[in-house]
């Protein structure tokens, strides 16, 4: 895709799905990308980014906290500020998915010929009616998260990000319109520590090559880019590819990079709605009734930040930095990490190296048993006598079996708690379409 700020990597491997635990210790199913895989910045506010993790599913609410889980009712009736607050409440690194992140996924799909279909016709795809999801009572045509076929995922496989086209509109952060002027928090800054309030100084205009701010003029059924403030205000919608540009300017490439103007050669029936009066936040994707007008690059800029309705929800994302620990569920923001304990045991000889390897295996068992001092335990293991090692080897097999049983018990308990909390029973075959 020639208009991208960085070259997005074409599909070379299966999407990486990970379970990430928030500060409450509850799991989210996320799809994880390196910055280069999506063409996103590798630095946020002077911190090096290791990975971006995107909610695989439109979020549901459990005890007032958003989670990315399959076969759940998507959370709706959430206004823009509340969506931001809920996502950030999950802990360090968590945020409302930004427009930069959303559009990067869209460009990835376009570049790899996997533009997703979705629930655009009350439980099914308008263009492929054989593609259906699971509707639910009171949903008015909405489907449970991730209940559609793989064609509803951004990469066309079971491992992709689900439901970016249709089902419910989704809030995105880091972009807005102010009296028809598009404004952004640049360089994906809304992903970490940004002030996205109405009066925030972080909002920036987008400029033409001549240095004039860009405005969208909504008038007489058309939406036209121009370098001056519109004379009046209006509300309307047009096909995304039918956005016009006044003859005395060119559409800035930055607008294309942000999915605010169609990239060269892009073709689609997706719609672009805008109200040029006052501040307007952005929704993406369309809903279950938008038909051909829905899609990844579909946009609505018609409502205030306080507006909430049953057709609009959201999904969280999180960012992990280079200095964070190697576990995805640790999103500690401290730049200064504690120095690791130095190992005083050296094993230059053959027998010593074998003991060192045994110590590492015993240390893993110790950590699995929730030991509080794995480094200290490893030193004890390396200093152990042959007789102690022989006894430990016999006991370790029993300990491993106990750990496996405990893990299975904990997993079962989580599943039972989740089922009790949501009161949703997942069946192998569901014919509950409205």
What name fits each language-model region?
Residues 350-355, 362:
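N-terminal acidic leader/helix
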Residues 12, 16-93, 179-224, 280, ...:
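Extracellular adhesion/carbohydrate-recognition regions
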Residues 40-164:
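Short aromatic-cysteine micro-motif
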Residues 426-434:
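Long, low-complexity, intrinsically disordered segments
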Residues 357, 377, 401-417:
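Beta-rich interaction/scaffold domains
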Residues 2-4, 15-18, 134-140, 147, ...:
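C-terminal, surface-exposed recognition/capping segments
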């Amino acid at each position: 895709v020639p208009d991208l700020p960085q070259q997005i990597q074409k599909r070379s491997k299966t999407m990486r799905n990970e379970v990430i635990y928030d500060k409450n210790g509850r799991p989210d199913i996320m799809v994880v990308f390196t910055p280069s895989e999506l063409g996103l910045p590798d630095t946020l506010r002077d911190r090096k980014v290791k990975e971006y993790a995107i909610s695989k599913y439109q979020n549901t609410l459990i005890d007032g906290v958003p989670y990315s889980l399959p076969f759940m009712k998507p959370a709706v009736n959430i206004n823009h500020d509340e969506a931001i607050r809920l996502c950030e409440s999950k802990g360090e690194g968590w945020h409302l998915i930004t427009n930069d992140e959303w559009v990067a996924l869209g460009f990835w799909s376009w570049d790899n010929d996997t533009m997703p279909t979705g629930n655009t016709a009350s439980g099914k795809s308008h263009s492929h009616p054989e593609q259906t999801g699971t509707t639910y009572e009171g949903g008015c045509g909405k489907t449970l998260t991730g209940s559609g076929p793989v064609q509803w995922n951004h990469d066309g496989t079971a491992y992709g990000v689900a439901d970016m086209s249709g089902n419910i509109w989704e809030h995105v952060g880091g972009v807005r319109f102010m009296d028809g002027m598009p404004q952004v928090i640049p360089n994906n800054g809304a992903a970490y520590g940004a002030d996205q309030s109405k009066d925030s100084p972080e909002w920036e205009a987008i400029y033409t090559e001549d240095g004039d701010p860009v405005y969208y003029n909504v008038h007489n059924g058309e939406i036209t880019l121009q370098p001056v403030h519109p004379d009046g205000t209006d509300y309307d919608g047009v096909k995304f590819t039918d956005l016009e540009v006044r003859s005395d300017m060119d559409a800035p490439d930055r607008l294309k990079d942000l999915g605010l103007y169609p990239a060269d050669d892009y073709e689609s029936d997706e719609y672009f709605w805008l109200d040029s009066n006052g501040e307007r936040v952005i929704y993406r994707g369309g809903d279950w009734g938008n038909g051909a007008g829905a899609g990844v690059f579909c946009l609505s800029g018609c409502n205030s930040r306080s507006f909430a309705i049953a057709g609009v929800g959201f999904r969280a994302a999180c960012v992990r930095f280079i200095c964070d620990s190697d576990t995805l569920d640790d999103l500690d923001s401290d730049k200064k990490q504690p120095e690791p304990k130095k190992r005083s045991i050296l094993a230059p000889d053959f027998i010593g190296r074998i003991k060192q390897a045994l110590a590492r295996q015993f240390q893993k068992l110790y950590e699995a048993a929730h030991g509080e001092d794995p480094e200290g335990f490893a030193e004890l293991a390396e200093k152990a006598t042959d007789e102690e090692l022989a006894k430990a080897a016999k006991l370790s097999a029993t300990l491993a079996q106990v750990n496996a049983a405990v893990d299975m018990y904990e997993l079962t308990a989580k599943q039972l708690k989740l089922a009790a909390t949501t009161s949703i029973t997942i069946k192998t075959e569901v014919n509950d379409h409205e």
